[in-house]
From Swiss-Prot:
Protein name according to UniProt: LexA repressor
Oligomeric and partner information: Homodimer.
Pfam families reported for this sequence: LexA_DNA_bind, Peptidase_S24
Highest classification ranks of the organism: Bacteria, Bacillati, Bacillota, Bacilli, Bacillales
Alphabetically ordered keywords of this record: Autocatalytic cleavage, DNA damage, DNA repair, DNA replication, DNA-binding, Hydrolase, Repressor, SOS response, Transcription, Transcription regulation
Cell membrane as UniProt keyword: no
Active site: residue positions: S130 (for autocatalytic cleavage activity), K168 (for autocatalytic cleavage activity)
Family assignment from sequence similarity: Belongs to the peptidase S24 family.
A molecular function GO annotation: DNA binding
Biological process (GO), any one: negative regulation of DNA-templated transcription
HAMAP family per UniProt: LexA
Function noted in UniProt: Represses a number of genes involved in the response to DNA damage (SOS response), including recA and lexA. In the presence of single-stranded DNA, RecA interacts with LexA causing an autocatalytic cleavage which disrupts the DNA-binding part of LexA, leading to derepression of the SOS regulon and eventually DNA repair.
Length: 207
């Protein structure tokens, strides 16, 4: 392989470190922040040089699709299969949860975290502390499978009567529904009707 410049070595080492520790490559923005480059076009230029020199392989059709190439075999290093899951921002009543207008970005996840049909999966960023006793903290990303039914005790994403999305534990009582927070300082939400958007099947947290 051809020799790298100092900056190219910094970028290559950072990508390799992230892939080894997280299982998926960093974004262009994250690379720039790590090596002190404010311009994304400059980062793209260095990535192109790394690819030309045989250190990485990229797929232009996918975000973050960077593979480290083994120096010994010149083949892409095998790493866990990564899928790109939509991160949902504002949840709008009457619009499918994964409609384009609801999607803020796509987030890479190791495929084993989903264990279901990838097209049914989305992510919500958790805001608040209503589920801390279930181990779901402010700033976490909950991995959600789209579905419209739930069983008692499921942790779900639901639309309230105020058209707000909330993550709570679901209970169907005789004449109403109870959305129970997992925080002993908070009261449950009681509703005559509830719209289930999905069931929480996993959690992702940056360390």
């Amino acid at each position: 392989m051809r020799e790298l410049t100092k900056r190219q070595s910094e970028i290559y080492d950072y990508i390799k470190h992230v892939v080894q520790t997280k299982g998926y490559p960093p974004s262009v923005r994250e690379i720039g922040e790590a090596v002190g480059l404010a311009s994304s076009s400059t980062v793209h230029g260095h990535l192109s040089r790394l690819e030309e020199k045989g250190y990485i392989k990229r797929d232009p059709t996918k975000p973050r699709a960077i593979e480290i190439v083994s120096e010994q075999t010149n083949d892409a290093v095998n790493m866990e299969e990564t899928i790109y899951v939509p991160v949902i921002g504002k949840v709008t009543a009457g619009i499918p949860i994964t409609a384009v207008e609801n999607i803020e970005e796509y987030f890479p996840l190791p495929e084993h975290l989903t264990s279901t049909h990838n097209s049914d999966i989305f992510i919500l960023n958790v805001v608040g502390e209503s589920m801390i006793e279930a181990g779901i903290l402010d700033g976490d990303k909950v991995i959600v499978r789209s579905q419209t039914i739930a069983e008692n005790g499921d942790i779900i994403v639901a639309m309230t009567e105020d058209d707000e999305a909330t993550v709570k534990r679901f209970y169907k009582e005789k004449t109403r529904y109870r959305l129970q927070p997992e925080n002993s300082t908070m009261s449950p939400i009681y509703l005559d009707n509830v719209t289930v958007i999905g069931k929480v099947i996993g959690l992702y947290r940056e360390l």
